[in-house]
Structure formats: C-alpha cells, structure tokens
Amino acid sequence: MLCCMRRTKQVEKNDEDQKIEQDGVKPEDKAHKAATKIQASFRGHITRKKLKGEKKGDAPAAEAEAKEKDDAPVADGVEKKEGDGSATTDAAPATSPKAEEPSKAGDAPSEEKKGEGDAAPSEEKAGSAETESAAKATTDNSPSSKAEDGPAKEEPKQADVPAAVTDAAATTPAAEDAATKAAQPPTETAESSQAEEEKDAVDEAKPKESARQDEGKEDPEADQEHA
C-alpha cells in the first residue's frame, strides 16, 4: 500500500510540474498578480472619487469619512485597553483575598510567637518578684530582730541602773562630799588662778602708785628748795 501511495503521489507531482511548464506561470504568481490588480483598481477608484470630489466640492466629505475610518480603529483600541484595565482590576481584587489569606496566616504565627514571648517574660517577672519579696521579707525580719535585741539589751542596762542607784544611796555622805569635790576641782582651780592673777595685777599696780606718789612728793620739795 505504501509503495502504491508513493507512486501515485509522484505521478500527481509530475502532472502538476508539466502543467506549470506548459503555462510558464505558477499558481502563487497568479494569485499575487490578481491581488495587485485588485489593489490597483481600488486605488484608482479612490483617486477618481477624490478628483470628482475636488471638482464637485465633496472633498470635505471624503476627508470626514477618512477621519471616521481612522477614528474607528483608535476607538476600538481604547475600548480594548479599557477592557484590559478592567480585567486587570478585576484580577487584582480577585488575587488580593488570596494575598490577604497568607498574610493572615503569617500574622497568626506571629501572634502565637508574641503570646509565647509575653508569657516567658511574665513568668520571669513573676520569679523575680518572688525573689524580691523574699529578700524584702528577710530585710524586714532583720530590723525586727535588731529591734528585739535592742529592748533585750536595754533591759539589762535598766536593771543595772537601779542597782547603781541603790549602791549610791548606800554610800555615806562623806563619800558624796568627796565625789562632789572630785567633780569640782576644775572650776575651783580656774577660780583660784583668776584670783592669783588679780592679786598679781594689784601687787604690780601698788609699786607703781607708790613710785608716783614719791615722785609727787619730791617735786614740791625740790620747788621749795629752789624757792
């Protein structure tokens, strides 16, 4: 079968080649020539209309038609762009919820992490607060113990004072006088020293006064002698 198909195809090709050789023109060339003829005739028709319009004053109408033809593709392009823009805007809101979902999913772990982080510092703060309270309790207990020791020490002192008072009461008046004298010597010595200084000053002043008196007596005697 394959051999038959190949043979038939070769025969058909040979027939086509023979026809092309006889005509001298390929079908592609024929189509191209026909298209060029149509375009040339169309252009000639347009040029003729333009010439007639110029003669009759229909040129503005032709220009308006040409502008309308030019504006129509532009309007179509704008509409296409607007359609594409709306499609993109619709796609953007459609995709935004999807983007929000991962963001929410990302926020959830972050919130969990924050919760864990807050719980850990809170536990640490609680532990530190307990240690501080224990330290304060120990410090509070230490002053109380000191206060307890203070009255305990004061009690023996107070107990010693009445004993000393009783001993002092038991002593004789002579001992009291001796104690008062022993306490007073500094003042007495100061008074005695002041008295001695005053006496010395008086003794020094007396010779000076006597010398002055003697001089006063000698002066009248000398005056009498001179007289």
Swiss-Prot record:
Expressed in the hippocampus (at protein level). Expressed in the dorsal root ganglion and the spinal cord (at protein level). Phosphorylated. Phosphorylation of this protein by a protein kinase C is specifically correlated with certain forms of synaptic plasticity. Palmitoylated by ZDHHC3. Palmitoylation is regulated by ARF6 and is essential for plasma membrane association and axonal and dendritic filopodia induction. Deacylated by LYPLA2. One of its GO terms (biological process) is axon guidance. Residues 9-32, 54-84, 98-127, 146-158, 202-215 have a biased composition (Basic and acidic residues). InterPro entries: IQ_motif_EF-hand-BS, Neuromodulin, Neuromodulin_C, Neuromodulin_gap-junction_N, Neuromodulin_P_site, Neuromodulin_palmitoyl_site. Gene3D superfamilies: 1.20.5.190. It comes from the Eukaryota. Identified in a complex containing FGFR4, NCAM1, CDH2, PLCG1, FRS2, SRC, SHC1, GAP43 and CTTN. Interacts (via IQ domain) with calmodulin. Binds calmodulin with a greater affinity in the absence of Ca(2+) than in its presence. This protein is associated with nerve growth. It is a major component of the motile 'growth cones' that form the tips of elongating axons. Plays a role in axonal and dendritic filopodia induction. This is Neuromodulin. It comes from Mus musculus (Mouse). The gene is Gap43.
